[in-house]
Design a protein with these regions (language model features):
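Secretory targeting and sorting signals
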Residues: 2-27
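Intrinsic-disorder/low-complexity, polar/charged segments
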Residues: 3, 140-147, 210-213, 251
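Intrinsically disordered, low-complexity boundary segments flanking structured domains
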Residues: 20-22, 96, 251
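Intrinsically disordered and other compositionally biased segments
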Residues: 9-13, 81-83, 264
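Short, intrinsically disordered low-complexity segments
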Residues: 1-6, 78, 90, 191, ...
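Core sequence-specific DNA-binding domains of diverse transcription factors
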Residues: 42, 133-134, 156-157, 161-269
């Protein structure tokens, strides 16, 4: 049985900068310290977000820290304090030599001189969030001590700053269902409430009703979405009974609606 979705579901978050956490937990020595980010959750496509990255050394570090801003986020810059992506450093309890040394593309290099237990803050202003929702965009952070032979090493997985990106408010519905069926054969229809970027909407608690151009169709009753559904529900037991071309439409109580592409209903043999 062939199926069709009315909008492409974009799951290739890695291509947009969501880096698997495994990169920060590879075998071998890890970097020095921990970097924590706040807030930890933002909305896809939102603008004007201020993020604070707080670094704490777990042993003394005199050297450098690098942090890579994932693709899809506003590129960091120091040219204009009022422009998106502006970054600044607050030395906190680290030495006065701690500063932003350079920005090259999406990579910040920070000259770091922090004793054990000391730390600084990196402020990232007016950032635009990627339009693809993902469980974790990692701002990969690495450190190295002074010395020509020293190498950059990523912080431990638990010490990496990670931001979850969730979908925004619902602006439409999306249907996934068969485009060919036989009279009297049950099939399922999956209905997602989506934001403008086709992410599952958040939050969503609408009540969805299915209707059909087939007057003899058997359809499940209305369903009120729960938080555990994460804006997605599969309606089972849909049966079309009139041969020819039919459609199914999903509508929620707020007026969002989506009609399926044509469904070919073959007579039973």
């Amino acid at each position: 049985m062939r199926t069709r979705t009315t909008r492409a579901t974009l799951l290739l978050a890695a291509l947009a900068g969501a880096v698997p956490l495994a990169v920060a937990s590879a075998a071998g020595p890890t970097g020095i310290g921990r970097m924590v980010v706040t807030p930890t959750t933002l909305t896809a496509g939102s603008t004007g977000n201020d993020l604070t990255f707080s670094y704490t050394a777990n042993r003394s570090l005199t050297g450098q820290t690098i942090m890579d801003v994932p693709r899809g986020w506003t590129a960091p810059q120091r040219r204009g304090a009022s422009s998106p992506g502006y970054v600044e450093l607050k030395r906190g309890t680290c030495a006065g030599s701690t500063r932003i040394a350079s920005i090259a593309g999406r990579r910040l290099t920070i000259a770091t001189a922090c004793k054990r237990g000391h730390g600084y803050q990196l402020l990232y202003h007016k950032a635009t969030v990627p339009t693809i929702a993902a469980d974790g965009y990692i701002f990969l952070t690495q450190t190295r001590a002074s010395g020509r032979k020293a190498k950059f090493r990523p912080l431990a997985r638990s010490g990496q700053p990670v931001v979850k990106v969730k979908g925004g408010p619902a602006t439409g519905l999306d249907l996934t269902l068969t485009n060919v069926t036989t009279v009297g054969t049950p099939f399922s229809v999956t209905v997602r409430a989506v934001d403008p970027y086709s992410n599952n909407a958040f939050p969503y608690g609408g009540t969805v009703t299915l209707t059909s151009t087939d007057p003899a169709a058997t359809l499940p009753g209305p369903y009120a979405y729960q938080p555990s559904d994460v804006a997605q529900r599969t309606f089972t037991g849909v049966v079309l009974r009139t041969p020819g071309t039919q459609t199914i439409t999903a509508t929620d109580a707020s007026g969002l609606t989506r009609q399926s592409p044509p469904i070919t209903v073959n007579a039973s043999s």
